[in-house]
A protein has these predicted regions:
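Membrane-integrated ABC transporters
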Residues: 1-44, 58-70, 84, 88, ...
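Transmembrane helices of ABC transporter permease
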Residues: 24, 28-38, 52, 66-69, ...
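Hydrophobic alpha-helical segments in the permease module
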Residues: 70-81, 174-182, 247-261, 280-302
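Loop segments that connect adjacent transmembrane helices in multi-pass transporters
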Residues: 101, 110, 116-125, 194-242, ...
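ABC ATPase nucleotide-binding domain helical subdomain, centered on the C-loop/LSGGQ "ABC signature"
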Residues: 101, 336, 355, 415-417, ...
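Cytosolic ends of transmembrane helices, especially the final helix of ABC transmembrane type-1 domains
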Residues: 221, 245, 293-322
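ABC-family ATPase nucleotide-binding domain "signature/switch" substructure
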Residues: 400, 433-437, 441, 449-454, ...
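Helix-to-loop junction immediately C-terminal to a conserved catalytic motif
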Residues: 406
Length: 602
């Protein structure tokens, strides 16, 4: 949204977005508004009933009838108010739930690139805080604006019936109050948006600092990080104070203007009573209407403030809903044929065990338009069985290659094939169901040991889980835990090396066809590394294992080693072949102090 857009252009999409959240629950809103209208009608009728009682008293007539009606109306209004507020409360909770469900679903459908553009703390704030503001705007405030408007109109009509001249004087004052509020509203809306954006920025900064708390403390950077976060906190406070001040100005103008209008009406009405143009009971009823007019006008101003906050929240939620998502719609015929190809590929392994499971055909990829390509004209065939290792200096394109395989990134040119079928003809889920991935910074999924290992394979049996844990030398550790597989994992009961082993176990529990390892042995001891190498060797006999290596000792025995530099594959071969033919590979080996002779002998 450009800064030059008019307020109307900025607000209309937000109005539509607000309605999009209300629409599934519109019948609840309509029912609430009907109840609210009946409640407003009861309130509008009461001053007129009081006038009838006063007239009856002045004329010496019985007041039993009007008093009974007034009492019944008060009880009826109380019941209506209870049902109305209960219904609006349920509607508000439902709106929040549906908004959060929509945003969370979008997060998990979004591309990696669109998620990475924003701090995770800010994304969390949009789900937790912005949806609460949206709730107030789409349920309570939206209904109250209509009800307040109806109450104001109904009250003004009754005031006109009582005394048109006195009404015109009162209405003139209200018009001035409304005009002043309309002038102040846009600035207040801008302040509300800046306030919410600053809260999101603060949340993102704090989340990042807490995530790196060990590094912060080890670097003695507590004070510096505190000050950085306080800069954002002070900025948030500044915008919040600005928004509060603007809201206070609106309230003061509306409330003060209403009081002045009522005082003027009282003075002018007293003059008309003295002139014989208005009865005392009529003036009393008129003043009751005037006082009754103040709450809906003030409520209207407050609701408009809430809706302005809702617009700001809606705008931030709309940004989430516009995040680029991974395409999942694919032509059914193509998908069917692709799946057939997959089945053929699986069955053909016994016939052609070294046929490629994954292929890169002249692939070029970049992270942003106009940037330098991260991969250039890469041709690559990964056999359906065997261990393929990828090495190279930082920035060579190793992680980019994995991102392409996992469809976190799309090729700009060329084609990626899964058993002969182009990626472009396969759904994301179909591709990823064939792969298992262990990333370099291995996260533990919130939950238990069991839920972590069942994360990619919910059908895993307990025996399969224990087999996977045994393979990475974690069986004894988990059995020693108080709750075994049902132990909840936290940063305090799992070390970095154990996190990495859990990630490897999570990947191998379902015996994947293609296992992608991004330096899976970086934080484990030599004994466990040997165990994982055994797992890799075993998996490579029946499937494909692809390893990104920063420690060449983990890939010396690979069937094929790819050497990458500046986005290209500059050499490929076995360890011994590359030691003889490629200077860069020899430099990498020397830099890491790997004894080539010992490795070859092993």
């Amino acid at each position: 949204m450009g800064m030059s857009d008019s307020p109307a252009k900025q607000s209309w999409p937000n109005v539509r977005l607000l309605w999009s959240f209300v629409r599934p629950n519109r019948w609840s809103l309509y029912a609430g508004m009907v109840l609210g209208l009946l409640f407003a009608a009861a309130g509008i009728a009461m001053p007129m009933l009081i006038k009838l009682i006063l007239d009856a008293l002045a004329g010496g007539e019985s007041i039993a009838g009007p008093a009974a009606v007034l009492g019944g109306l008060l009880v009826f209004a109380g019941i209506l108010g209870f049902v109305y507020h209960n219904l609006m409360g349920v509607l508000a909770a439902q709106v929040v739930f549906e908004a959060r469900e929509s945003m969370v679903r979008r997060y998990f459908r979004a591309t990696i690139a669109s998620i990475a553009k924003r701090p995770s703390g800010e994304l969390v704030t949009r789900v937790t805080s912005d949806t609460v503001l949206l709730r107030e705007a789409t349920s309570t405030a939206l209904a109250q604006v209509v009800l307040s408007g109806v109450s104001i109109i109904g009250t003004l009509v009754m005031m006109t019936v009582l005394d048109p001249v006195l009404f015109l004087v009162t209405f003139g004052g209200l018009v001035l109050v409304g005009a002043a509020a309309a002038v102040l509203m846009p600035a207040m809306g801008r302040s509300q948006r800046l306030s919410q954006e600053s809260v999101g920025k603060l949340g993102g900064r704090l989340e990042g600092a807490l995530h790196a708390i060990r590094t912060v403390k080890a670097s003695r950077a507590e004070s510096r990080e505190h000050e950085r976060i306080m800069v954002d906190a002070r900025e948030s406070r500044r915008h919040s104070v600005s928004a509060a001040r603007r809201a206070a100005v609106v309230w003061a103008v509306v409330s003060g203007g209403m009081q002045l209008a009522i005082a003027g009406s009282l003075a002018f009405g007293a003059w008309r009573v003295g002139a014989g143009a208005l009865e005392v009971s009529g003036l009393v009823a008129f003043l009751l209407y005037a006082f009754q007019l103040a709450p809906p006008v003030a409520q209207l101003a407050a609701d408009l403030t809430t809706i302005q906050s809702g617009f700001a929240a809606a705008s931030r939620i709309r940004e989430v809903q516009e995040m680029e998502v991974e395409e999942t719609d694919t032509d059914d015929t193509v998908v069917s044929e692709s799946l057939d190809n997959v089945v053929v590929g699986l069955s053909s392994r016994t016939i052609a065990p070294v046929a490629p499971v994954l292929e890169f055909v002249n692939v070029t990829a970049r992270y942003a338009p106009g940037s330098e390509p991260a991969l250039r004209d890469v041709d690559l065939a990964i056999p359906s069985r065997g261990h393929t290792a990828i090495v190279g200096p930082s920035g060579a394109g190793k992680t980019t290659l994995f991102s392409l395989l996992l469809r976190f990134l799309h090729a700009e040119d060329g084609e990626i094939l899964l058993e002969g079928t182009p990626y472009s003809q396969l759904p994301f889920d179909q591709v990823r169901s064939r792969l298992a991935y262990v990333e370099q910074e291995t996260p533990v999924v919130p939950g238990t040991v069991r839920s972590n290992l069942q994360f990619t394979y919910p059908e895993a049996t307990e025996d399969e889980i224990w087999d996977a844990l045994r393979a990475v030398h974690l069986e004894d550790t988990v059995r020693a835990m108080e709750n075994g597989l049902d132990t909840v994992l936290t940063s305090t009961n799992v070390s970095g090396g154990q996190r990495q082993r859990i990630a490897v176990a999570r990947a191998i529990v379902r015996r994947p066809e293609v296992l992608l390892l991004d330096e899976a042995t970086a934080q484990i001891d030599g004994r466990t590394e040997a165990a994982i190498q055994e797992v890799i060797t075993e998996l490579a006999e029946t499937g494909a294992v692809v390893t990104i290596a920063h420690r060449l000792s983990t890939v010396i025995d690979a069937d094929t080693i790819l050497v990458m530099e500046k986005g290209r594959i500059r050499a490929r071969g076995t360890h011994s072949e590359l030691m003889q033919s490629d200077d860069l590979y020899r430099e990498l080996v020397t830099a890491l102090r790997i004894s080539t002779d010992v490795a070859l002998a092993g």
